[in-house]
Amino acid sequence: DIFLRWKLAGYKLIQSRDSLCFHFISRGHRSWAKNGVGKDDDMFKFYNNRASRNYLRKWHKWMSHDEYRMPITHPVYNIGFVITDVTSEDFLHFIETWATNIFIDNTICGDRYISKEQPTTKIDLSTRIHNHSYIEQINNDILLYFSQKDFMLNANENSAIITRLTDIIAEGVEDNAEMELGIFKMKTKIVKDISQTLIKV
């Protein structure tokens, strides 16, 4: 996160090939004797997963680097997922991190998910998960409509679309447009990159 924010802020990152530096111990302790050599400690996996999910909540796309390990910047969009036929907290666990907000038709399932997931993040999940009546009030720039039932019929392919959604939008989706891709229907008001607003913590 910090290196991506530096890059977006216009900082020049210089890599020295002839220097010594302290290495963060967060990765140094990832394997303990009790787990065996090369096996990640359970606590490391917990914190790594938690950090990864918070990163996705903010940036909506996993980090990528160039050949010199410099972060590659990408746009971030204010996007809401409008989902029907929601029955599974496990489904929400996957889908929630990839959007700014999600709107679901099963508030009981949503409340159970929030109760379980909230202890793992400082982000107030009640500001991210709403029922359908909040769609106009939240006013996302982009809305993506789909159902859990249709999604699960081809979960691998549909998951791949969700994880590539930022790139798909960046490749040429226009303002005030409607488009369909498989089970997904997208409506846009404005296709606006909000990444610059995420630099300051």
Locate predicted features.
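Conserved donor NDP-sugar-binding/catalytic core segment of glycosyltransferases
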Residues: 12, 160-179
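Short glycine-/small-residue-rich flexible loop motifs, especially phosphate/cofactor-binding loops
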Residues: 3, 53, 159
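Residues that scaffold the ATP/ADP-binding catalytic core of kinase and kinase-like folds
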Residues: 24
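Short, well-ordered secondary-structure micro-motifs within conserved domains or adaptor modules
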Residues: 133-168
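C-terminal, non-catalytic tails of nucleotide-sugar-dependent glycosyltransferases
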Residues: 13, 30-136, 175-201
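A short, conserved alpha-helix in the catalytic core of glycosyltransferases
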Residues: 1-20
